[in-house]
């Protein structure tokens, strides 16, 4: 599967697969299964989201994440085009990327990522 381009934009684009390490001086979120870095705390937008299997966080950008094909899903906030995202290291499905929101009030989610809390842990400097 192609990697998900972590930059802004509505499309999941193939990119070179590699493992990124976030600076140790930053509070980070990592995959609970393999400890691959996923996101910096500074990229967290909201803690008030619901994933398929429980609470989830919305991030502006992520690393070490690949994505599947986009599909339309009727979510709690309306119809969206989303692509499942997975950890590039252990291949665990983590959540999804919002490709397109069909309701004007939900457009802010486009290009953003949902990661379920059950699939991530806090690392570095949370004391």
From Swiss-Prot:
GO terms for cellular component: nucleolus. InterPro entries: Yippee, Yippee/Mis18/Cereblon, Yippee_fam. Its main location: nucleus. Coiled coil: none annotated. Widely expressed. Detected adult brain, lung, colon, small intestine and ovary, and in fetal brain, lung, liver and spleen. Pfam families: Yippee-Mis18 (PF03226). The keyword Zinc applies. GO terms for biological process: negative regulation of erythrocyte clearance; negative regulation of erythrocyte differentiation; protein localization to plasma membrane; regulation of cell shape. Keywords: Metal-binding, Nucleus, Phosphoprotein, Zinc. Zn(2+) binds at residues 31, 34, 87, 90. One of its GO terms (molecular function) is metal ion binding. It is found in: Nucleus, Nucleolus. Residues 27-124 form the Yippee domain. The modification Phosphothreonine is found at residues 92-93. The modification Phosphotyrosine is found at residue 98. PANTHER family: PROTEIN YIPPEE-LIKE CG15309-RELATED. Belongs to the yippee family. This is Protein yippee-like 4. It comes from Homo sapiens. The lineage of its organism: Eukaryota, Metazoa, Chordata, Craniata, Vertebrata.
